[in-house]
Structures are given as structure tokens and as C-alpha cells.
Regions:
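Multi-pass membrane proteins that catalyze or facilitate reactions on polyprenyl-/lipid-phosphate substrates
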Residues: 1-262
Length: 262
């Protein structure tokens, strides 16, 4: 992988991780377009780690709050993490095999999940604007957000979009919905990084150090910008432009694959 490719992928990861457009789906599509094949999944995980840096910066106070009595939010975060953790362990390899295979089926699957995210955002916007409730976060809503996150391990389904939508439907107030959704990314990304790191130790993945460094730094900077933008978007509950963009990406995913096979 060239350094410029790593920077491009890092920028895409940083923006797409926190905007509701699916970072894994974008990385998968872009890696295919750039011809990046070696260590693609491991590089993807490392870029996700890069996006954790701005989460710690922006939500430092919220993270400290997890360790204060009565530890209610910490318990909710653990509960919200369990579904995605189990899904990743049980189905992670199957999902990766289907989506990272480079086949026409993988392109169709990615297009489908992009469209599902577009639909989800459209429905979420309608619900959020119609509901007048602004409930505090609860165990019930945290569980709903956790179940939503377990579905969003599939490339093309936006983790942030899916989780925030679940919070919206549960009636959680926008500020708590946003902060908890971003906090939920921490254990999931760290867990995925641990699994990927074990694969590297076993010698299954070739590491390209310099591209990874540039990619991670780029992801951190663009991720910070994306978080600030997304916090404003959530306050206005205006997701329609993201829905339209995802429809376009669904078309790009399937059309580029079909064109290459002609």
C-alpha cells in the first residue's frame, strides 16, 4: 500500500466513522477501487483505532463519568456492548468472508446495506421530528442501542447511524443519545483491534508500518472534525442528505463491479 492510499483511506475512515454513512462500507469499496488487497481488514481496524483518539478528546468528561458512583452508565455501556461482542465472535468471520470476497455477491450485499442505512436514517429523521419526548438514557434504551450496534457490524450499515436511530426511536434526548452512541464505539473498536492483533501475532497478516501511521493520524484528525459536525446534525435531526448520499454509494458499489467484469 502506498502512503497516499493510506492517507485517502484514513480521511474516509475519519469522516465516515462518525457521520452516518458506514466507515467499513466505504473502506471496503475504496480498497476495491484502489486495488488494496493485502492486510485490508487489519488496516481497517487500525484506522478505527485512529478514530478513537478524537472520541477520547471530545468526550473526555463523559468517559471520566463512567468511573463515578453509582457506575450506572458504566453498567449500561457493558450491557450495550455484549450483543455486538457476541455477534462479532459468532458471525464475524462469516460476514468478513462474504463482504471481503471481491465477488459480485459482495458488491450486491454492500449496495443492499447502504440502502438499508439510507432507509433507516430517513425513518429516524421522521420519528425524531414527530416525537416530543426527550427521555434520559435508561437500561432499556441502552439495550436497544446495543442490539442495534450488533446488527451494524455488517459493512454498509452505519454503526453511528444505526445506534443513534435506535436511541431516537427509544425517545432518548439528543445530547445523551449522541454521547452514549460515541462512547459505545470504544469497547467495540478495542475488541476488534485485539482480535486483529492476535491474527498479526500468529503471522496471518503483513504489517506495513509507515502507511498505517499516516492512515491512523489522518483518521484521527478527520474523525475529530466529523464528531463536531455530527453533534450539530443530531441537534437538527437532518439526515436526508446522508440518505441520498448512501443511495448514490449503493449505485457506485454495484455499478463499478459490473463495469469491471464487462
Amino acid at each position: 500500500m502506498e502512503i497516499w492510499q493510506a492517507i485517502v483511506l484514513g480521511a474516509v475512515q475519519g469522516f465516515a466513522e462518525f457521520l452516518p454513512v458506514s466507515s467499513s462500507g466505504h473502506l471496503l469499496l475504496l480498497q476495491r477501487l484502489l486495488g488494496v488487497t493485502e492486510g485490508g481488514l487489519f488496516f481497517d481496524i487500525m484506522l478505527h483505532i485512529g478514530t478513537l483518539i478524537p472520541v477520547f478528546i471530545v468526550f473526555f468528561g463523559d468517559i471520566l463519568g463512567l468511573f463515578k458512583k453509582p457506575f450506572k452508565k458504566m453498567v449500561w455501556l457493558i450491557v450495550a456492548t455484549i450483543p455486538a461482542g457476541l455477534t462479532g465472535v459468532l458471525l464475524g468471520d462469516v460476514i468478513d468472508k462474504q463482504f471481503y470476497s471481491g465477488t459480485t455477491l459482495s458488491a450486491v450485499l454492500l449496495s443492499t446495506t447502504f440502502l438499508l442505512t439510507a432507509t433507516e436514517l430517513f425513518v429516524s429523521e421522521r420519528i425524531q421530528k414527530q416525537k416530543n419526548t426527550a427521555l434520559p438514557l435508561s437500561l432499556k434504551s441502552a439495550t436497544a442501542m446495543g442490539l442495534a450496534q450488533s446488527v451494524a457490524i455488517v459493512p454498509g450499515l452505519s454503526r453511528s447511524g444505526t445506534v443513534i436511530s435506535a436511541g431516537c426511536i427509544s425517545g432518548v434526548n439528543r445530547e445523551e443519545n449522541a454521547s452514549f452512541a460515541f462512547l459505545m464505539s470504544i469497547p467495540i473498536i478495542l475488541g476488534a483491534a485485539l482480535v486483529s492483533g492476535l491474527d498479526v501475532i500468529k503471522g496471518g497478516v503483513e504489517i506495513e508500518t509507515l502507511p498505517i501511521i499516516f492512515g491512523v493520524l489522518t483518521a484521527a484528525v478527520t474523525g475529530y472534525i466529523a464528531i463536531k459536525v455530527m453533534l450539530k446534525v443530531i441537534k437538527k435531526a437532518n439526515y436526508k442528505w446522508f440518505s441520498l448520499y448512501l443511495i448514490l454509494m449503493a449505485i457506485v458499489s454495484i455499478s463499478t463491479k459490473l463495469i469491471w467484469e464487462i
